[in-house]
């Protein structure tokens, strides 16, 4: 494997795993709360986008990036509505 491909595949593997964990958890949570399928799917996709960058976000915040998988599951469990409301409250936009 070339020297260019190996780091790229490592990044994609890690981000893909985190995104998949957030997606699955969000989809399970939404279906458990009996939300309709398309709303559940959209919520899960948005959580997957956040979960995919959990590793970099933890590094940016100065935290240990080894917990990015746990952070991705937490993102999926909380959902984008709750995370968005929390961010609005923290920034004073609510």
Curated annotation (Swiss-Prot):
InterPro entries: Phage_lambda_GpS_holin (IPR006481). GO terms for biological process: killing of cells of another organism. It comes from the Viruses. Keywords: Cytolysis, Host cell lysis by virus, Viral release from host cell. The keyword RNA-binding does not apply. Belongs to the lambda phage S protein family. Essential for lysis of the bacterial cell wall by disrupting the cell membrane, thereby giving hydrolytic enzymes access to the cell wall. This is Putative lysis protein S.
